[in-house]
Amino acid sequence: MSKTPRKPSQSPALQLGRAVDWPQTPDEAKLDRVPNPQADTDYLVRFTAPEFTSLCPVTGQPDFAHLMIDYAPGAWLVESKSLKLYLASFRSHGAFHEDCTVAIGKRIAQEIKPKWLRIGGYWYPRGGIPIDVFWQTGKLPKGVWVPEQGVATYRGRG
């Protein structure tokens, strides 16, 4: 059973429960972690970001993606408000689709050291070509159920 949640005043380092400025860059963004109260159990956590945006590093035009982040936590969980702020920091960041997707996966893995993590970046077409990017760490723990990401590949009209 989980312990009584801490009040925000007891967790001054966390962004949760208090007003914080929006980070302007991914490097400036703080990704918080919290202890996993079920660390002795293998299970899956999924974050879905269907409106992720970044900028093309060449044209400065916006790029849009549907991100799916799945992970089997170890001792730590990603705190969701900090993840939201981290992902939002890409709105003014210029990088190619592959770089954004893999960098996000690596940053989360570095911060929380999950037993397993995968990220799927389903990017909307630019120049007529959709790009889907996938990255994962190691092997999935035995017995953990991972549903399909459920994001259809891009299909044009017709």
Curated annotation (Swiss-Prot):
Amino acids binding substrate: V78, E79, S80, H97, E98
Pfam families, per the entry: QueF (PF14489)
Active-site residue numbers: C56, D63
Compartment(s) where it occurs, according to its Swiss-Prot or TrEMBL record: Cytoplasm
EC number: 1.7.1.13
Keywords linked to the UniProt accession: Cytoplasm, NADP, Oxidoreductase, Queuosine biosynthesis
Any Gene Ontology biological process: tRNA modification
A GO MF term: preQ1 synthase activity
Catalytic activity: 7-aminomethyl-7-carbaguanine + 2 NADP(+) = 7-cyano-7-deazaguanine + 2 NADPH + 3 H(+)
Gene3D superfamilies in the record: 3.30.1130.10
GO CC annotations on file: cytoplasm
Database matches in HAMAP family: QueF_type1 (MF_00818)
Protein family: Belongs to the GTP cyclohydrolase I family. QueF type 1 subfamily.
Role description: Catalyzes the NADPH-dependent reduction of 7-cyano-7-deazaguanine (preQ0) to 7-aminomethyl-7-deazaguanine (preQ1).
Full protein name: NADPH-dependent 7-cyano-7-deazaguanine reductase
Originating species: Rhodopseudomonas palustris (strain BisB18)
Lineage of source species: Bacteria, Pseudomonadati, Pseudomonadota, Alphaproteobacteria, Hyphomicrobiales
Gene: queF
